[in-house]
């Protein structure tokens, strides 16, 4: 949620947020569960798509939009389901009119099986939206060159995946994700592929600025409890990063220093 005081706020496009967790709103078993999960997680933003099919009772009809307003959490519209630059740009423009916000999570799908982003067209779509005044948060792979190009065209934050959407596998390419953190100075948020709170904690320990979740919470046996677990994990990972973890060692080192000879070994004769 928006933050005005915290010294460790998440800052995106000049706006401060108290939470470093962003939460998706799809696939929850009911509107009441969705509402309770959002209230438990207290996310910075919740994502929503204009291209809803209405097959899920938690997502169908005007009640869903009423729920979003009632939650009083900033909405991050997305372009889910778009396969072309023009489709994504048009959807973003419609979302700006509906929600009255310049924020957009840019999704441009290149493969329907893996839901992998169309990296060839993603940069051009982002460039057009940035020029049109949008605060673009692009969903992308962990490819360093792609992410750098997105920054070059004006994206002030980038959202690489940990694994394909909905797989819950956690970070499948830790080396690439850590390289991104070392090379890019903009905020980085992991979007997609996290399945466990420990996954979220791990990427936060690597120095990521936040995470965006949906399926891992919505499809949990207890989505509300899982929302809270992820919120706690994100904060724990952030705190650990700031605290500065010890370096891994190859050899064992005693945690209690031993000085001199134990008293029971002294010669009392």
Curated annotation (Swiss-Prot):
Write out the annotated subcellular location: Cytoplasm
The superkingdom listed in its UniProt entry is Bacteria
Keywords on this record? Cytoplasm, Schiff base, Thiamine biosynthesis, Transferase
Q: What class of enzyme is it?
A: transferase
The main location class comes to cytoplasm
The catalysed reaction is: [ThiS sulfur-carrier protein]-C-terminal-Gly-aminoethanethioate + 2-iminoacetate + 1-deoxy-D-xylulose 5-phosphate = [ThiS sulfur-carrier protein]-C-terminal Gly-Gly + 2-[(2R,5Z)-2-carboxy-4-methylthiazol-5(2H)-ylidene]ethyl phosphate + 2 H2O + H(+)
PANTHER family with a match to the protein in the record: THIAZOLE SYNTHASE
Q: What does this protein do?
A: Catalyzes the rearrangement of 1-deoxy-D-xylulose 5-phosphate (DXP) to produce the thiazole phosphate moiety of thiamine. Sulfur is provided by the thiocarboxylate moiety of the carrier protein ThiS. In vitro, sulfur can be provided by H(2)S.
The name of this protein is: Thiazole synthase
> What organism does this protein naturally occur in?
Paracidovorax citrulli (strain AAC00-1)
């Amino acid at each position: 949620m928006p933050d005005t005081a915290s010294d460790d706020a998440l800052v995106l496009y000049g706006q401060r947020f108290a939470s470093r967790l962003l939460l998706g709103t799809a696939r929850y078993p009911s509107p009441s569960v969705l509402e309770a999960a959002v209230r438990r997680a207290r996310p910075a933003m919740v994502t929503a798509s204009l291209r809803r099919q209405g097959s899920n009772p938690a997502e169908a009809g005007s009640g869903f939009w009423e729920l979003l307003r009632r939650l009083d959490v900033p909405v991050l519209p997305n372009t889910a389901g778009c396969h072309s630059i023009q489709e994504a740009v048009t959807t973003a423009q419609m979302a700006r009119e509906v929600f009255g916000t310049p924020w957009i999570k840019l999704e441009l799908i290149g493969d329907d099986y893996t839901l992998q982003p169309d990296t060839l067209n993603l940069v051009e779509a982002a460039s057009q939206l940035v020029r049109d005044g949008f605060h673009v948060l692009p969903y992308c792979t962990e490819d360093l060159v792609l992410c750098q190009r997105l920054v070059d065209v004006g994206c002030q934050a980038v959202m690489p995946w940990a694994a394909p959407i909905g797989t819950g596998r956690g970070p499948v390419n830790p080396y690439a994700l850590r390289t991104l953190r070392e090379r890019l100075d903009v905020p980085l948020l992991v979007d997609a592929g996290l399945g466990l709170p420990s996954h979220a904690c791990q990427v936060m320990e690597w120095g990521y600025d936040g995470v965006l979740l949906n399926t891992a919470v919505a499809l949990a046996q207890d989505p509300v409890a899982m929302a809270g677990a992820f919120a706690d994990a994100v904060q724990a990972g952030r705190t650990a990063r700031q605290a500065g973890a010890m370096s891994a060692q190859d050899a064992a080192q005693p945690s209690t220093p031993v000085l001199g000879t134990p008293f029971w070994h002294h010669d009392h004769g």
